[in-house]
Structures are given as structure tokens and as C-alpha cells.
Swiss-Prot record:
Region (Disordered): 1-37, 114-158, 170-210, 225-293, 323-375, 397-605, 948-981
Keywords: Nucleus
Pfam families cross-referenced by the UniProt entry: DIRP (PF06584)
Subunit structure: Interacts with SNL1 (via PAH3).
Biased composition (Basic residues): 1-11, 27-36, 131-140
GO biological process entries: DNA-templated transcription
Any single GO CC term annotated in Swiss-Prot or TrEMBL for this entry: DRM complex
Expression (tissue specificity): Expressed ubiquitously in vegetative and reproductive tissues.
Superkingdom assignment: Eukaryota
Localization annotation: Nucleus
Name of protein: Protein ALWAYS EARLY 2
Length: 1051
């Protein structure tokens, strides 16, 4: 026997491979080191490394200087290569790195390089025999007999399990996977073919497979031709693609499982396996009954094997049904977990029963023909076995081609069908004559509609589990039928169609409804149809309103009509047409109801509206939670009303003089927040403390009332309400029901009183549960005056047209008369106001005063009021933080300074010609009662400030209430008499000087003195920007004095 020619691919595969190296992962590092070592030049000596290290520490990375310092013909590249090789070590600080470390690293480098060179020589020497060994091993000899295969494998196998392998192959036993990492479970393998395929290259293996398949196909064609000569079978002609359809079915797998031992013994014998198949087929042809029972057993075995391997494909129509159900499950259309499992199990049972019915007689007439065709069943099983031996890719390609042909055929049928309006009767006729075919047509069309959809819907019919399996069996029995009978049925004679219509009319209505319901449930998995069913239900409810717009169409459609129209006709319609009409009808209905409601509301009179409101209020108060809310919100006893009428924040605003202002600026709020501090957290401890305060207040009020009754006290404080007396009408909370009722006081005790309720009798009620029928009569006197004042202020504001003034009735401001605005200094906000307003006035002198004067006045007044409020707030806060003695000093200094400035200004304004101004001012100050030193200092200070103001020609107003724009700033005569005096600034300067003088006369705490200086310096802020440099100098000097004073504070 001539030797087989070698395959070039075997040698190519081994000759193109490179020999593996142990140091393959270090190849890049070795290359990099070789490059750096090449740049290093000859080996560096110890002296050169010491010189390099010293020069590097001295010159850094200036490699020319470093190379010149080594003086041993070392170039710049060599020096730089040495640095790059030891960059990480040389980057360390000088104390950490050293010369000895660098020398050690280079010595190690050179030793490593020498070792790697010697290892490379060893690898090169051992590379050649390894390649030769691989080439020798890759020469398998091809042989057809199993004995020669065993000999060749025994020669080439390196392990020592040869005897065991021979025994296992000879006895036909099954090997087990006994590797180190494999589980100890039996593995289904084929012995000889796997060994041969593992030792042969892939191209030879594929060639062998195709040759074997061609031989099998040729042999099976001959066998089928021989069988067809004996007697033709309609099953073979009806299913030209039978081989592809039944390639994965259960009888094939069971056939291979039953003949596994014979195939394992005769797998390597080329033509013996086909002879055995022919003998077995001829034996089955002799006894038809035995063959029928054998096929039934094969089906049961396949049914048991198919769920284990995870394949649920049985026949063609079963595939269609399961694809439909799996598609719906994959798209998330399962109703619930239990329903999904139940539906899967039912579909599986139905498919198994349908596959059994393939071989069961459909009618009693064909039962004899079924028994006589056992031989053809055996041939059919042989064809299935041949299909199982085909390659998987060919089977998949044939299956995809078949599915494409079916889709195109169905699309042609769909195009040839009539529209929905004219085809409802034909659909019904088809459903009555051939219910199985029509139902299959609906299912397949639903499946195609699902595949054509771009968006998967999550809506699914919950009735899919209710479909009985008996209804599904006729579907699968006709699964091998094509669309041709349906096309021929459409071209039937007119007499046959008339018979169909007559039969349809004779059927009962209930039976038609049941059939349509089954169709609807089976097609309910389609999202489009489920949506249309929901639309129909919605339209049934709104049929009256929809008929107005669409009188010619019958909107209320029954489920029978929807099912007869078919899913394809439903999908052809626009999806939102009915929804749009429904929305329009609902909108029109809402508009009509609104118009009628408005007309009814306009026609009502005022009394009817009041009665309606009363009814609504009574209805809301009928709920216990609403009454409880009203009690908490508005029920206050005579004792608790003054306590809850007070608010600490409002008291604070009244104290600083801002209680009457409806809106505060950002500056004012920032000052208030900074002065109040951090608010408390609403916690249980806070509530406990507040309740304790309320208890103490109640006890003190009761004590006052008891003393008043006994005669120990003649009157009550103005902040306490009048006590309740016998005979007063009250609104009390009943102690049993905790509901409010009207009553009358019979007796009064320390903290309780007897109340006679109108309908419930006499009960003992706490004083905190009794509210006067008219709370204004029992209001404290101080609170009454405040409320009256607030009401009067509100009326004045309404009369003046200022509606923005909001005054609270419960929390009115108090103590406004105690706030003085005469000593409030200006702040920084006014510094830029005066020049802007001055420019506006000068630019608007030529314009009519009727248009601009009122605007400027209003704007100036608002700004001035805002500045004054900020000044008053800051001043009040400063005074609140001061000690009483310091507060007296500030007030006294400002009072005396104001009097002195007024006297000096009056004297300077009354000077006549020829008189000395200084003399007149000194006389005026003597009248005030100050000594000569103070008078001389005051005059000098006054001359200095007055001169600076006159030099800049921008005087400040003498009165804070007068606006800046109203001053005659642009007067033509420049006489000093008409010039306005900066009285406020002068007063602030004199008051500051007096404060400092009074602090030096007595010894005060340094902290209080520093606080007083801060308040004095703050009051000196000028309005004119030209005076800011002088103010900065004063501020600097005062800061030094404050630092010296604070240094005396004990720590």
C-alpha cells in the first residue's frame, strides 16, 4: 500500500511557530537594557562613578559639565545614559542616596548582563532538537483498518495506559473522564473517531466529513428510490423539506441512542454501517405492527431526552407555536411567574401530544392505510437519520431558506387578501368550514406581525392559560399543510361558498362566540391586538359621545368582529385614530360641563352662594380631624391668650425700632441674624422647656386672680387679661367628648370652673379649656392699646395710598415713642448716594420740574429712610450690648454735643459784619456751661471740619429728615450764610471727643472702653467720599488706642 502524501498544512503549522523562551516576558526590558548598555560605552570603573556622582550633585543635569568633570573620555550621551539607568535612585535626596549605592547598582547591572548572555547561548543550543522533535511527532499515518490505527497510536502515545485502552476498545465499554481536574462522571464520547479527529489536521477532518456525507446521501437516495418503486407514499411527496424539519426531532436521537453499541464497534468500518442500516430497515419492513410499536417507543424516548438536553423542537408546526410563545415570553409578556410556568408546561404537553398524533390515525377511515404504511415509516426514520448526519451549518441554512420561503408565501397571501370592510364575511366562512386552518392562519400571521414589530410591548393577555389543550391539538395535526389549499379555497365555486354561508347561518350563536373567544385568546399575545381590545372597551363606554362626530360608523364592536377581522387587519389601521376621537369627545364633554357650570354660577344670587359656602363649611366641620385642627388653631383660653400673643422676635423688632416696617432689607436681616445668634433645634427638650415656662406663667396668673378675688390685690398688670366671672358666656371644651360647646359659668375656683352647657348639662371644666365668647372684652389693656394703634396705622396707610404697609393685629409693635432717631449716625450706604443725586439734580435743572422733581424726591426719601433704619438698628444693637454705665456715657455725650453744636451754629449764623466769629462761638459755648479749654478745642475742631467741607463744596444736610436733593446745592451766591452746616458730622465728632474725655476721668473696664471706642468710630462715618481719607486716619489712630487699652485686659 502506497504511503499517503503528507499535508503541507501540518508542517506549516509547526515551522512557522517560534520556539518558546523562558524569559519571553522580559524581552522588552532586556532590549531596553541593551540599548542603555550600548550607550554606556565600556564598563564604568569605581573612580568614574565617584566622579560622576560628585559632579551630578554639584551641577545637576548639565551633562557637559558632568562629563568634563569625569575626565576619562566619557561623552555626554554616556553620562546621560548612566543617569537614565539609575534615575529613580539618583532622584532621591542626597542624604538617602550615596556613592556606594550607585556603585553597587552598577556592579549588579553588569553581573546581570553577563548572566543573561550565557543563558541566551544555552537557549540557542537547545532550540534545534526541540523543533525536530515537533516535526517528527506531527506525522500521523493514515490507515483504514482499526488494527493499524491501534498500532500507530501505541507507538506515538507517551503514556503507559496502553493495555487499559486496548481492553476498553475491545470490550466495547465506555471510558470515564479520569483527569486530574475533571469530575468523576461518565462522559459520552465516541472512541475511535474522536482519537482520529484529534490527531488529524482540521482540513483533512472536514474533507473526510464531506466525503462521508456524500456517501450517505448517495446510499439513502438509492434506498428511497427502491422503496418508492415498491409502493409510493404520499408523505414523502408532501414534505420535500422533511429532512431539514426532522433533523433535531426526538426519534433520531433515540435511534442513535439505541444503536450506540453497534456504532461504537463499527464506526471506523466505512461501508459496514450502511449495510447494517439496510438490514435493519428490511427487517422492520417485514413486520409492520412491530415497526409501529418501535416508532412509538422511539418517540417516548425522544420526549424524555429532549427536555434533558434543553431542546423543545419537535415538528414544524410545533416549532411555530413554541417560537410564538417563546417570543412573547422573551419580550416580557408573561402575566406572572406562576402563570408563565403553567403556560410553558401546558404548551409542552400540547406539543408532545401533537407530535404523537403525527403517527396516530386522524380518522377511522385512514386507520387501515396507516397500518399498511409501516415500511414507509421505516424509510422515513432512515431519512431522518441521514439528515442527522449532515453538518449543522447546512441544516441551519436549509431551515432559514425554508422560513424565508414561508414568509414570502404568506406575504403574497396577505397582499392578495381583501380589506377589512369587505372580508369579514369571508373570514367567518373560512372559520366555520375549516376551523383548524383558519386558527393556524391567525397564529402564523400573529407571529409574523410580532416579528415585524420594532418595539416589544409588555402587555399580554392574562387568558393565555385558559386555552384548553383539546383546542390546540387540531392545530398541530395539520401542521404539514401549506398555504396552497387556502388559495384554492378562495377560488372555489360559488355553489360551495353558498353552502358555506348556509352552514354558517345554521350554526348557533353561542358556538360562534366561543370560537371567536378562542381566537381572541390565542391572538391576545400580540401587543397590537391587546391594545385594540382595550380601545374597544373604552369606546363602548363612550359610544354616545362618539356617535355625535361619527354617525356613520358603528364604534361598539363585539369581540367576534375583532377576532374575525384578523390581527393583520387590525395592524393595518392607524393605531391612534380612535384614541384621538375619544380624547376629542372627552374634551368637548368637559368644555360643555364647564360652560354649564359657569352659567349656573352666574345665575346664582349672592344669598345662594353664601348658603353654598355654609354648606361646604358644615360639611368640612363634620369631620373630627377638621374640628381638632380648628381647636388647635383658634381656641385660646383667657389665661393663655396673652402668652401666645407675644413673640420674642416681634419684641426684639419693637426694641430696635423695626416693628412697624413691613419689609426689611438684606442688610437689616443680616444684622438681625448676627445679633440673635444661632436658632434652637426643634427637639423634645425644647418643647419640654416651653411647656415648663407655660406652666409657670399659668400659675403666676392664677395667683394674681386669687389675690384679686380675696382682696389682697387691687388691680391687675396691663399685660394680664380680665378673669372670668360668674354668668359669663364661654366656649368650652367638654371634658368627656373633647368637643367645643357653648355654655355659661356657674362657679369659679382656683383653676377650675363649673360650666352649664346648653345641651349637655353641668360639667367641671379646667380654666385653660374655657374661652370667652367675645375675646376682645377680656383682652389685656396693653394689648388692647397696641391693637388700636395698629388699626389706626393701617387706616392711615390705606387713606394715604400706601397699601404695602402690612400691620399684624395679633403682634403689634410697641414702644415706638421711646426710639430716638436724632442721634443715629449715617452709614456707608449713603456715601455714594449724594454724588449720584447731585448729578441728577444738576442734569435735570433744565428739564421740567413736574416730571423729575417728584421722582427724585420719592427716590431720595426711600433711600434716606432705609439708611436711617439701618443706623437705628445698628445703634440699638450696640446699645443693647453695652453696659448701663457705658450707655449713659454715650447718651450724655451725644446730648451735650448736640446742644453745643446747635449753639455754635446759631452763633455763627448770627454774626454781623465786623464781629469775630470765634468770639461769638466762645460766648455761645460759655452759655452752655463748658470751660475755656473745651471751648478752644471745639472751635479748632469746628474750624477744621468746616474748612474741609467748604473746600470740597459738598456739604451734608443739617437734618436727617430733609433730603439731600432738596438742599440748594447749586445756589449762585457763594456766601457763607447760605452754606449749609454739616451739623450731624460735627455732632458725632464732638460726641466722640466727649466720650473719650469722660472715659479718662474715671477708671472703667478696658473691654467696655474698647466697645465704646468702636461705637464712637462707627458714628464718624462720613457721607462725602472726599472725607474718607480723614476717616481712615481717625480709624487707624483709634485702632492703636484700642490695642493699647485691650493689652491691659487680664487673661
Amino acid at each position: 500500500m502506497a504511503p499517503v502524501r503528507k499535508s503541507r498544512s501540518v508542517n506549516k503549522r509547526f515551522t512557522n511557530e517560534t520556539s518558546p523562551r523562558k524569559d519571553a516576558g522580559k524581552s522588552k526590558k532586556n532590549k531596553l537594557r541593551k540599548k542603555l548598555s550600548d550607550k554606556l560605552g565600556p564598563q564604568w570603573t569605581r573612580l568614574e562613578l565617584e566622579r560622576f556622582y560628585d559632579a551630578y550633585r554639584k551641577h545637576g543635569q548639565e551633562w557637559r559639565r558632568v562629563a568634563a568633570a569625569i575626565r576619562n573620555s566619557r561623552s555626554v550621551d554616556m553620562v546621560e545614559a548612566l543617569f537614565n539607568m539609575n534615575r529613580a535612585y539618583l532622584s532621591l535626596p542626597e542624604g538617602t542616596a550615596s556613592v556606594a549605592g550607585l556603585i553597587a547598582m552598577m556592579t549588579d547591572h553588569y553581573s546581570v548582563m553577563e548572566g543573561s548572555g550565557s543563558e541566551g547561548e544555552g537557549h540557542d543550543a537547545s532550540e534545534v532538537p526541540r523543533k525536530q522533535q515537533k516535526r517528527k511527532r506531527a506525522k500521523p499515518q493514515r490507515s483504514d483498518s482499526p488494527e493499524e490505527v491501534d498500532i500507530q497510536q501505541s507507538i506515538g502515545s507517551p503514556d503507559g495506559c496502553l493495555t487499559f485502552l486496548k481492553q476498553a476498545r475491545a470490550n466495547g465499554t465506555q471510558r470515564h473522564a479520569t483527569g486530574k481536574r475533571t469530575p468523576r462522571v461518565p462522559v459520552q464520547t465516541s472512541f475511535m473517531r474522536d482519537d482520529r479527529e484529534g490527531s488529524t489536521p482540521p482540513n483533512k477532518r472536514a474533507r473526510k466529513q464531506f466525503d462521508a456525507n456524500d456517501d450517505v446521501a448517495h446510499f439513502l437516495a438509492l434506498a428511497l428510490t427502491d422503496a418508492s418503486r415498491r409502493g409510493g407514499s404520499p408523505k414523502v411527496s408532501e414534505s420535500p423539506n422533511r429532512r431539514t424539519e426532522l433533523s433535531d426531532s426526538s426519534p433520531i436521537k433515540s435511534w442513535g441512542k439505541m444503536s450506540r453499541t453497534r456504532k461504537s464497534q463499527s464506526k471506523h468500518c466505512g461501508s459496514s454501517i450502511f449495510e447494517e442500516w439496510m438490514e435493519s430497515s428490511r427487517e422492520r419492513k417485514l413486520d409492520s405492527d412491530k415497526d409501529t410499536t418501535l416508532l412509538m417507543d422511539m418517540e417516548r424516548a425522544g420526549e424524555m431526552e429532549a427536555p434533558r438536553k434543553g431542546k423543545r423542537v419537535y415538528k414544524k408546526r410545533v416549532k411555530v407555536e413554541e417560537a410564538e410563545c417563546n417570543d412573547s415570553d422573551d419580550n416580557g409578556e408573561a402575566c406572572s411567574a406562576t402563570q408563565g410556568l403553567r403556560s410553558k408546561s401546558q404548551r409542552r404537553k400540547a406539543a408532545i401530544e401533537a407530535s404523537r398524533e403525527k403517527y396516530s390515525p386522524r380518522s377511522p377511515k385512514k386507520r387501515d392505510d396507516k397500518h399498511t404504511s409501516g415500511a414507509f415509516d421505516a424509510l422515513q426514520a432512515l431519512a431522518e437519520l441521514s439528515a442527522s448526519m449532515l453538518p449543522a451549518n447546512l441544516m441551519e441554512s436549509e431551515l432559514s431558506a425554508q422560513l424565508k420561503e414561508e414568509r414570502t408565501e404568506y406575504d403574497m397571501d396577505e397582499k392578495s387578501s381583501t380589506p377589512e370592510a369587505t372580508s369579514t364575511s369571508s373570514h367567518g366562512e373560512k372559520a366555520n368550514v375549516e376551523p383548524d386552518d383558519s386558527l393556524l392562519h391567525a397564529i402564523s400571521s400573529v407571529e409574523n406581525a410580532n416579528k415585524r414589530k420594532s418595539k416589544p410591548s409588555r402587555l399580554v393577555s392574562t387568558d393565555c392559560d385558559d386555552v384548553p389543550t383539546g383546542k390546540l391539538q387540531p392545530q398541530t395535526s395539520g401542521s404539514l399543510r401549506k398555504r396552497k389549499p387556502k388559495v384554492l379555497g378562495d377560488e372555489a365555486p360559488a355553489e360551495f361558498s353558498q353552502n358555506k354561508s348556509i352552514n354558517k347561518k345554521e350554526l348557533p350563536q353561542d358556538e360562534n362566540n366561543m370560537k371567536s373567544l378562542v381566537k381572541t385568546k390565542r391572538a391576545g399575545q400580540v401587543p397590537a391586538q391587546s391594545k385594540q381590545m382595550k380601545t374597544v372597551k373604552a369606546l363602548e363606554e363612550s359610544a354616545i359621545t362618539s356617535d355625535k362626530k361619527r354617525p356613520g360608523m358603528d364604534i361598539v364592536a363585539s369581540p367576534k368582529q375583532v377576532s374575525d377581522s384578523g390581527p393583520t387587519s387590525l395592524s393595518q389601521k392607524p393605531p391612534n385614530r380612535r384614541k384621538k376621537s375619544l380624547q376629542k369627545s372627552l374634551q368637548e364633554k368637559a368644555k360643555s360641563s364647564e360652560t354649564t357650570h359657569k352659567a349656573a354660577r352666574s345665575s346664582r344670587s349672592l344669598s345662594e352662594q353664601e348658603l353654598l359656602l355654609k354648606d361646604k363649611l358644615a360639611t368640612s366641620l363634620s369631620f373630627p380631624f377638621a374640628r381638632r385642627r380648628c381647636i388647635f388653631e383658634w381656641f385660646y383660653s383667657a389665661i393663655d391668650h396673652p402668652w401666645f400673643s407675644k413673640m420674642e422676635f416681634v419684641d426684639y423688632l419693637n426694641h430696635v425700632g423695626l416693628g412697624h416696617i413691613p419689609r426689611l432689607t438684606r442688610l437689616e436681616w443680616s444684622v438681625i441674624k448676627s445679633s440673635l445668634g444661632r436658632p434652637r433645634r426643634f427637639s423634645e427638650r425644647f418643647l419640654h422647656e416651653e411647656r415648663e415656662k407655660l406652666k409657670q406663667y399659668r400659675e403666676s396668673v392664677r395667683k394674681h386672680y386669687t389675690e384679686l378675688r380675696t382682696g389682697a390685690r387691687e388691680g391687675l398688670p396691663t399685660d394680664l387679661a380680665r378673669p372670668l366671672a360668674v354668668g359669663n358666656r364661654v366656649i368650652a371644651i367638654h371634658p368627656k367628648t373633647r368637643e367645643i360647646h357653648d355654655g355659661k359659668i356657674l362657679t369659679v375656683d382656683h383653676n377650675k370652673c363649673n360650666v352649664l352647657f346648653d345641651d349637655l348639662g353641668v360639667e367641671l371644666v379646667m380654666d385653660i379649656d374655657c374661652m370667652p365668647l367675645n375675646p376682645l372684652e377680656y383682652m389685656p389693656e396693653g394689648l388692647r392699646r397696641q391693637i388700636d394703634k395698629c388699626l389706626s396705622m393701617k387706616k392711615e396707610a390705606q387713606l394715604s395710598g400706601n397699601t404695602n404697609l402690612g400691620v399684624s393685629v395679633l403682634f403689634p409693635p410697641c414702644g415706638l415713642e421711646n426710639v430716638s432717631f436724632s442721634m443715629n449716625p449715617p452709614l456707608n450706604q449713603g456715601d455714594m448716594i449724594a454724588p449720584i443725586l447731585h448729578g441728577k439734580v444738576s442734569s435735570n435743572t433744565s428739564s421740567p420740574r413736574q416730571t423729575n422733581h417728584s421722582y427724585i424726591t420719592t427716590y431720595n426719601k426711600a433711600k434716606e429712610a432705609e439708611i436711617q433704619r439701618a443706623q437705628a438698628l445698628q445703634h440699638a444693637l450696640d446699645e443693647k450690648e453695652m453696659e448701663p454705665e457705658m450707655l449713659e456715657i454715650v447718651k450724655g455725650s451725644k446730648t451735650r454735643a448736640q446742644a453745643m453744636v446747635d449753639a455754635a451754629i446759631k452763633a455763627a449764623s448770627s454774626v454781623k459784619e465786623g464781629e469775630d466769629v470765634n468770639t461769638m462761638i466762645q460766648e455761645a459755648l460759655e452759655l452752655v456751661g463748658k470751660n475755656q479749654l473745651l471751648r478752644s478745642s471745639m472751635v479748632k475742631h469746628h474750624e477744621h471740619v468746616n474748612g474741609s467741607i467748604e473746600h470740597h463744596h459738598n456739604p451734608s444736610p443739617s437734618n436727617g429728615s430733609e433730603p439731600v436733593a432738596n438742599n440748594d446745592l447749586n445756589s449762585q451766591d457763594g456766601s457763607e450764610k447760605n452754606a449749609q452746616m454739616p451739623s450731624e458730622l460735627i455732632t458725632s465728632c464732638v460726641a466722640t471727643w466727649l466720650m473719650i474725655q469722660m472715659c479718662t476721668e474715671r477708671q472703667y473696664p478696658p473691654a467696655d472702653v474698647a466697645q465704646l471706642i468702636d461705637a464712637a468710630v462707627t458714628s464718624l462715618q462720613p457721607r462725602c467720599p472726599q472725607n474718607l481719607p480723614i476717616y481712615r486716619e481717625i480709624q487707624t489712630c483709634m485702632g492703636r488706642i484700642k490695642t493699647q487699652i485691650m493689652s491691659l485686659v487680664p487673661t
